Amino acid sequence: MAPKKAKRRAGAEGSSNVFSMFDQTQIQEFKEAFTVIDQNRDGIIDKEDLRDTFAAMGRLNVKNEELDAMMKEASGPINFTVFLTMFGEKLKGADPEDVITGAFKVLDPEGKGTIKKQFLEELLTTQCDRFSQEEIKNMWAAFPPDVGGNVDYKNICYVITHGDAKDQE
């Protein structure tokens, strides 16, 4: 009986290890991100969930090879624990500015360094910790979009991690 207990405990530590890497707020934010990606709400992120997520971001022609490569990053089905583990491994030792910039880059498949104001505003007001209209107004005052309606997310990332706007050269 003792060996079973020890075995169970070791297994539990293995799965709880990933949860000890993040605080409760971070885990909740990852859970919200997981829920956004898990489009069919079955508790598993699959290829169709990824395709639907890209479509929701305006990227309609994602190649199967690209989706397959993403799915192969996991050793099996991507439930929340696997999702959290994958991010834990990627974020280990990462610079916070790089992490935040990387999150924005997902929304910028063309690598322009900008995203559409309308799209960002929709995300911020409809997903996860929703921004109020006052918060949106303050954001656009701090980070005004250009004449084409594009927002420079690299500057946003810099301010989030350093507190001051980067000098424009």
Curated annotation (Swiss-Prot):
One Gene Ontology MF term: calcium ion binding
Q: Which domain of life is it from?
A: Eukaryota
Cellular component GO terms, alphabetically? myosin complex
Loss of function: phenotype? Deficient mice completely lack skeletal muscle and die immediately after birth because of respiratory failure.
**Extra remark beyond the main annotation:** This chain binds calcium.
Which species does the entry assign this protein to? Mus musculus
Q: Which residues carry this modification: Phosphoserine?
A: S15, S16, S75
Q: List the gene name.
A: Myl11
**Could you identify this protein by its name?**
Myosin regulatory light chain 11
Residue numbers of N,N,N-trimethylalanine PTMs = A2
